[in-house]
Amino acid sequence: MFAVFLQGALLGAAMILPLGPQNAFVMNQGIRRQYHLMVALLCALSDMVLITAGIFGGSALLSQSSLLLGAVTWGGVAFLLWFGWGAMKTAFSKNIVLASAEVMKQSRWRIIATMLAVTWLNPHVYLDTFVVLGSLGSQFAGDARSWFALGTMTASFTWFFALALLASWLAPWLNTPRVQRVINFFVGVVMWGIALQLARHGWQ
């Protein structure tokens, strides 16, 4: 069973590591040290729910409904364009103001809402968990499927907490106006690139 667990962990890591809306948001919260561990936990818990749904039967729902898949795809395109636009606005802003403790208190629920949107409106999450993991997980039966799912969940929890903690540790070097502009510009380019790829896929 350990081999199945390791297979799930490696596959989960391969899909989580590339930069996407989730990773960008967790990284930025870590740099700002704004509820970064809470954000990492909520991202990991969301992934756990999606992984469970995808591996234990949810993949059939998405793959069999072209209407639902289209809604997820184009909703994701719109969200990625909006997310990228926000990053670009920050990148080219003349004044990047670091959040104070009072601002962080006021923005807790907004941070949670943004994190949930970044996760649940991200089409790659459904494609990865429902289509890729769902199809691979269906090859296992009984306990083996549970071990495969546990491996992918372990990779998710490990990565999000590691990213949040590393970004927080590097915050003194990363949390400067110049570096923030570079990071946000890069995030904006990547988000728009993903949106373009999804749009091309949606038109096919």
From Swiss-Prot:
Signal peptide as annotated in the record: none
Taxonomic lineage from the root: Bacteria, Pseudomonadati, Pseudomonadota, Gammaproteobacteria, Enterobacterales
Reported function: Involved in the export of arginine. Important to control the intracellular level of arginine and the correct balance between arginine and lysine.
Subcellular location per the Swiss-Prot or TrEMBL entry: Cell inner membrane
Domain of life of the source: Bacteria
Entry keyword rRNA-binding: no
PANTHER family in alphabetical order: ARGININE EXPORTER PROTEIN ARGO, ARGININE EXPORTER PROTEIN ARGO-RELATED
Annotated TM spans: 1-21, 37-57, 67-87, 111-131, 147-167, 179-199
Membrane topology: Multi-pass membrane protein
Keyword annotations: Amino-acid transport, Cell inner membrane, Cell membrane, Membrane, Transmembrane, Transmembrane helix, Transport
Reaction it catalyzes: L-arginine(in) = L-arginine(out)
Cell membrane found in the keyword field: yes
GO cellular component: plasma membrane
GO MF annotation terms: L-arginine transmembrane transporter activity
InterPro entries in alphabetical order: Arg_export_ArgO_enterobac, LeuE-type, Lys/arg_exporter
Source organism of this protein record: Pectobacterium carotovorum subsp. carotovorum (strain PC1)
Family named by the database record: Belongs to the LysE/ArgO transporter (TC 2.A.75) family.
Predominant place of localization: membrane
Name this protein carries in UniProt: Arginine exporter protein ArgO
